[in-house]
Regions:
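Histidine/acidic-residue-rich, glycine-tolerant segments that coordinate divalent metal ions
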Residues: 16, 56-63, 69-70, 82-180
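Acidic/His- and Gly-rich active-site-bordering loop/insert found
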Residues: 1-64, 73-77, 81-89
Length: 180
């Protein structure tokens, strides 16, 4: 890869937002598609369809597993579909192609940039394993394959069972309890 381009992307600056403003006023609706590759070794057996058809990752241990290539395809397909009906549309549509979903950094960076500040409705999706048939769509409002990371500090105070046990503050117990 071009070293200058890689440097510009350092820190997760690889997100893309397509904004489609229509002539009639209306709500701002956003659709989010994650697009990061994962640290996964792709199969290299002769019967592996991506290898067989020439679209396997060129980089070892970097592949768009977890459906992320499908998410990008869905996003681009939605953009094409919307553009075909642009005369009938109102408001604004934002197509958010988010990097770093797996490491929980991409959404935070895009939110910090103000990309979703004006959004009235937000839709996100993830190719997954809830559907029972290949031609099915499962809609949920919960956190399917969602994650959040946070840092927490627990401070305690040591004591002795025979000398003022009531002064003890068990940080380890608090930390363990917060995990369950």
């Amino acid at each position: 890869a071009d070293a200058d381009l890689v440097e510009k992307m350092r820190g997760g600056k690889t997100g893309v937002v397509g904004v489609m403003k229509f002539s009639r006023p209306g709500k701002i609706v956003a659709f989010r598609f994650d697009m990061d590759c994962n640290d996964v070794e792709e199969c290299d057996t002769a019967d592996h369809r991506p290898l067989e058809n020439g679209f396997q990752s060129l980089h070892a241990k970097e592949m768009h597993a977890c459906g992320h290539d499908g998410h990008v395809t869905i996003g681009l397909g939605l953009a094409k579909l919307i553009s075909e009906y642009k005369e009938e549309m109102a408001g604004t549509i934002k197509l958010i192609f988010q990097p770093a979903e797996e490491g929980v950094r991409g959404a935070r960076a895009m939110v910090a940039k103000g990309i979703v500040d004006d959004v009235d409705y937000m839709f996100g999706g993830h190719i997954g394993f809830k559907a029972t048939k290949s031609d099915s769509l499962v809609c949920l409002t919960g956190g399917f394959l969602a994650t959040t990371k946070l840092d927490a500090s627990f401070k305690g105070e040591s004591s002795h069972a025979g000398a003022a046990p009531e002064r003890g503050r068990n940080a380890l117990l608090a930390a363990a309890a917060s995990c369950i």
